Curated annotation (Swiss-Prot):
UniProt protein name: Early transcription factor 82 kDa subunit
Similarity comment: Belongs to the poxviridae VETF large subunit family.
Species classification: Viruses, Varidnaviria, Bamfordvirae, Nucleocytoviricota, Pokkesviricetes
Function of the molecule: Acts with RNA polymerase to initiate transcription from early gene promoters. Is recruited by the RPO-associated protein of 94 kDa RAP94/OPG109 to form the early transcription complex, which also contains the core RNA polymerase. ETF heterodimer binds to early gene promoters.
Source organism of this protein record: Vaccinia virus (strain Copenhagen) (VACV)
InterPro entries: Poxvirus_early-TF_lsu
Single GO MF annotation: DNA binding
GO BP terms, alphabetized: positive regulation of DNA-templated transcription
């Protein structure tokens, strides 16, 4: 979403508090008639045409700095008083009554401060109105003062207005509020809240659960086992969690909803922690190693680490990365994270232009510096030059050659050449792996001329070359595999999947000579690279792709056995590859690929793969593949609109012993909790006779882990 910098309003008033000048400050060239500022002008002040001024008050200024700036803006050389009708600025009464120089009272103590604008005016990011009056036009001229403007502020503002049209303010904000409170709701309060949700009929999903030992949080159709015995969860209309409480604490994501629901309840609230962290994703990358060329202490304080900034009051920390910014604040200030992101983007545009290729480092998990690097006797990394030598021959629009050197010009106008002091690596070529993965033309220096290479033809002459020919050389497992390559499987899976299969290799190398069928690793078909960074990414991919995935020494299956497809994927350096069977005749270099024998892994799945009815009644059937009503799979989200009670589930010794061989494949901090989750999802519906547990388990879970696969 594109961030819009809100307009600001400066009002200069006279002796009778009449408006003499109304300055509409904006970095844009027009009035935003939908803005709250314009509505305030038109509806409350009856001003239709204010002065449009292309300037911007920095919200990071102290009151003395702000007063100097406003004097410069209005060209006033006299003492002035600044104030606001919404918040106290320079002066405030001890009881926080809003200060107004025209209605001053001596009955209350008046305090003066030099705080930062965004602290004393919390809504300033969206709505800032400042009133200015000459001190001599009030009854308290002694409260006025004159401040010289800081020229660095004016210089920065001028540069800001110059670069503003080119700023990409398309950002996405993720926030993490530590919005957990201690409360006295208890079970009685939670019951009142859920009753109010149902009485209001507001279509919010709600769930109140209480269990004897472990709380099972039902999110959609999934069970999540927690140690809480009592829990209330309410979801917004878009499915996000609005609030959750165990009666003693409450986590609030939707403040308005919570306030409405507890309006008739005497709640006691104590914030446990107040820090808020925002992660702001940027549409256009920035330079994370920021360097300021002018004095900007009125905005940021630079730290010893050049990608970390502090606000001037040191209460807001900002960590810069190429594609996102993390902002941590002590207290909630509306949209302050967007405003500071705007300032960071602006400063990057002013002082830290990003050369997309000059500082190129990696694509996905592959680093340029590791593949094209200088060593003692090899100088393979190209250098950047600023001009072409006279007399160089133009080979194409982006490639020039002379007897002494070759020059490649990338899409950003950066010129690369090779100048090996030893006179060996002086031929410009391109790295195949980057071109195969992302069609990037990343230069490197070679011993011999590269013009006959297909990647050279694509990068220099824009000739598309089909990568249909696959090299018969098989790489060791662990490297990212491109379209023209293949690699061995990891040793454990090579031995398992290729049991009984052979591949004849040429002596002294890894060139495939002949095979009637052998499992290897290939890149996935298509141009899109799938990258899985976390366990959550892996699980989501497997369930959506509905195929088996190998990650290190683990095998991931889709949740439902009937969903398992006929492909096998494998993760290498976070990138998804495909397991295939390769076939090759000794008399030909032609290589053919066939689907893998997926059943070898699928048969390891411990669940019964044939849909078997477990229990049925009145058109409702519970099977090993789901719950059906009148033949239709029931997949409605669980809700407190439908209430049921169950006894606490206890994992018997017989069940635990039966599944114990499987536990070495299960990631769990508590095996007993794992058994209970399994029991809740399946066994509780079977009405299992304690004396007949083993036969029932063998019927539905034949692969308990005891059977040895030969």
């Amino acid at each position: 979403m594109r961030y819009i910098v809100s307009p600001q309003l400066v009002l200069q008033v006279g002796k009778g508090q009449e408006v003499e000048r109304a300055l509409y400050l904006t970095p844009y060239d027009y009035i935003d008639e939908k803005s709250p500022i314009y509505y305030f002008l038109r509806s409350h002040l009856n001003i239709q045409q204010p002065e449009i001024v292309k300037r911007h008050i920095l919200l990071t200024l102290r009151m003395t700095q702000l007063k100097g700036y406003l004097g410069n803006l209005l060209d006033i050389k006299d003492d002035i008083i600044i104030y606001s009708h919404k918040n106290n600025l320079e002066y405030s009464y001890v009881d926080n009554t809003i200060f107004n120089p025209f209605v001053y009272t001596q009955k209350k103590t008046l305090l003066k401060n030099d705080s930062f604008l965004y602290n004393v005016y919390p809504g300033a990011c969206d709505f800032l109105v400042i009133w200015v009056v000459r001190a001599c036009d009030t009854s308290i001229p002694e409260f006025g003062s004159y401040e010289d403007v800081d020229n660095n502020i004016i210089k920065f503002e001028t540069m800001l207005m110059e670069v503003f049209p080119q700023l990409d303010l398309d950002i996405t904000v993720e926030s993490k509020f530590n919005n957990i409170f201690r409360t006295n709701l208890k079970l009685t309060g939670l019951k009142k809240i859920i009753q109010r949700v149902q009485d209001l009929d507001i279509n919010y999903k709600s769930l109140l659960s209480r269990y004897d030992e472990h709380f099972i949080n039902m999110t959609g159709n999934h069970f999540i086992l927690n140690d809480e015995q009592l829990n209330l969860s309410i979801w917004d209309l878009d499915g996000t969690l609005a609030l959750s409480s165990d009666g003693d604490t409450v986590m609030i994501n939707n403040v308005k909803l919570f306030t409405d629901l507890v309006s008739d309840i005497d709640t006691q609230m104590e914030r446990i922690k107040g820090d808020i962290t925002y992660k702001v994703h940027l549409a256009t990358p920035i330079n994370s190693r920021i360097k300021l060329d002018i004095e900007t202490s009125f905005i940021f304080i630079e730290t010893a680490t050049n990608n970390i900034l502090l606000s001037s009051d040191k209460k807001i920390s900002i960590i810069l990365a190429k594609n996102h910014i993390s902002i941590k604040v002590k207290n909630h200030i509306p949209n302050i994270e967007k405003y500071f992101t705007f300032l960071v983007i602006a400063i990057n545009a002013m002082f830290n232009s990003v050369q997309k290729s000059a500082d190129f480092t990696k694509v996905e998990t592959v680093y340029w510096s590791r593949i094209c690097q200088n060593t003692k006797n090899k100088n393979r990394k190209p250098i950047i030059i600023n001009y072409l030598d006279p007399g160089m021959k133009k080979i194409s629009n982006n490639f020039y050659r002379s007897d002494e050197k070759e020059v490649f010009i990338n899409d950003n106008g950066i010129m690369f050449t090779c100048m090996d002091p030893l006179g060996k690596y002086n031929k410009v070529g391109f790295l195949n792996i980057f071109h195969d993965m992302r069609k990037y033309c990343i230069p490197c220096c070679f011993l011999h001329d590269q013009s006959h290479r297909s990647t050279f033809s694509s990068c220099v002459h824009q000739i598309d070359v089909e990568k249909k020919i696959v090299s018969p050389y098989i790489l060791n497992f662990g490297k990212v595999v491109t379209e023209s390559k293949m690699s061995f499987l990891p040793i454990i899976f090579d031995a398992f999947l290729n049991d009984g299969m052979t591949a004849n290799m040429e002596q002294d190398n890894k060139r495939l000579k002949e095979t009637s069928g052998y499992h290897i690793v290939r890149c996935c078909a298509g141009d899109d690279i799938v990258r899985l960074r976390t366990t959550s990414d892996i699980i989501q991919f497997v369930n959506e792709d509905k195929n088996i995935l190998i990650v290190n020494d683990m095998v991931y299956f889709p949740m439902n056995a009937s969903d398992i497809g006929k492909k096998i994927h494998i993760l290498i350096q976070e990138i998804v590859h495909e397991v295939m069977i390769v076939k090759k005749k000794e008399s030909s270099d032609k290589i053919d690929f066939f689907p893998p024998n997926y059943k070898l892994l699928k048969d390891l799945f411990p669940k019964q793969t044939i849909q078997t009815p477990i229990q049925s009644d009145a058109g409702m059937v519970l099977t090993t593949d789901g719950f059906y009503i009148d033949g239709k799979l029931f997949n409605e989200d669980l809700s407190s609109k439908y209430v049921t009670f169950t006894k606490n589930v206890i994992a018997s010794d017989a069940v635990a012993k039966y599944f114990s061989p499987l536990f070495k494949y299960v990631i769990s901090e508590a095996k007993d909790r794992f058994i209970k989750t399994w029991m809740i999802n399946i066994m509780i519906h079977m009405n299992v006779d304690p004396n007949n547990i083993i036969p029932t388990l063998e019927k539905y879970y034949p692969n308990s882990g005891r059977a040895q696969i030969n």
